[in-house]
Amino acid sequence: MTEFVVLIPARLDSSRLPGKALADIHGKPMVVRVAEQAAKSKAARVVVATDHPDIQTVCQAHGIEAVMTSNRHESGTTRLAEASAALKLPPHLIVVNVQGDEPLIAPELIDRTAEVLVENNVQMATAAHELHDFDELMNPNAVKVVLDKNRNAIYFSRAPIPYLRDAMRAGKREMPSETAVLRHIGIYAYRAGFLQRYAEMSVSPLETIESLEQLRVLWHGYPIAVETAKEAPAAGVDTQEDLDRVRAVFQTV
């Protein structure tokens, strides 16, 4: 398999769950749990990119490499662009972006996302899974993605896409039988050189409207290959309820 590294963007500020990167999960901070899970993948290196010295200190205390970045980044991808430059990663090296609030992420998904980047010879790759719940389709916190015939992303949106016209007209809460509805999984793979290019691209209007960083890539004309996972991954941590659920999982391990 082609060599890759995992970079984990982790900021201390969080509107819905303040300080969640340092939230305790069965004796260890969440960011440490994420890094340990990422280390179970085939990554040659796992590095946390953070904006706060407390996170860096905690990571280093647990033997995890961490690099400081600016606290002015609007997205995890631009944070990783700064981190990859600071780490002097070669332009061809594959970087997998694992979100800092995913302590249950499957190592196999990390590996597969890196593989998809290489197999499709694209600048960026990500993942999705089939959605079967109507309420989740309508939920703006569940990002949807539609693909072309080559399994590249056409668009990502918080809106319900594809729009189920006939079902909506009839007032039915039905999922389509003609095609799968896909929910985006927040994991990305790209080469370090493309990370620098991303940071230099102008911000797209759609990226701002939807608050979805990956739309910058589509806006500038680059394809994004999408791996369809066989099952939905464990949910990340956005709320106190999410944190309680994850803590319960680790208590049983």
Curated annotation (Swiss-Prot):
Catalyses which reaction(s): 3-deoxy-alpha-D-manno-oct-2-ulosonate + CTP = CMP-3-deoxy-beta-D-manno-octulosonate + diphosphate
Classification via SUPFAM superfamilies: Nucleotide-diphospho-sugar transferases (SSF53448)
HAMAP family given in the database record: KdsB (MF_00057)
Assigned keywords, A-Z: Cytoplasm, Lipopolysaccharide biosynthesis, Nucleotidyltransferase, Transferase
One GO biological process term: lipopolysaccharide biosynthetic process
An example molecular function term from Gene Ontology annotations: 3-deoxy-manno-octulosonate cytidylyltransferase activity
Physiological role: Activates KDO (a required 8-carbon sugar) for incorporation into bacterial lipopolysaccharide in Gram-negative bacteria.
Gene3D superfamilies reported for this sequence: Spore Coat Polysaccharide Biosynthesis Protein SpsA, Chain A
Top-level lineage group: Bacteria
Lineage: Bacteria, Pseudomonadati, Pseudomonadota, Betaproteobacteria, Neisseriales
The protein's enzyme class: transferase
Entry GO CC: cytosol
EC number(s) recorded for this UniProt protein: 2.7.7.38
Protein name in UniProt: 3-deoxy-manno-octulosonate cytidylyltransferase
Localization in the cell: Cytoplasm
Family: Belongs to the KdsB family.
Biological source species: Neisseria meningitidis serogroup C (strain 053442)
Keyword Transferase: yes
Pathway this chain belongs to: Nucleotide-sugar biosynthesis; CMP-3-deoxy-D-manno-octulosonate biosynthesis; CMP-3-deoxy-D-manno-octulosonate from 3-deoxy-D-manno-octulosonate and CTP: step 1/1; Bacterial outer membrane biogenesis; lipopolysaccharide biosynthesis
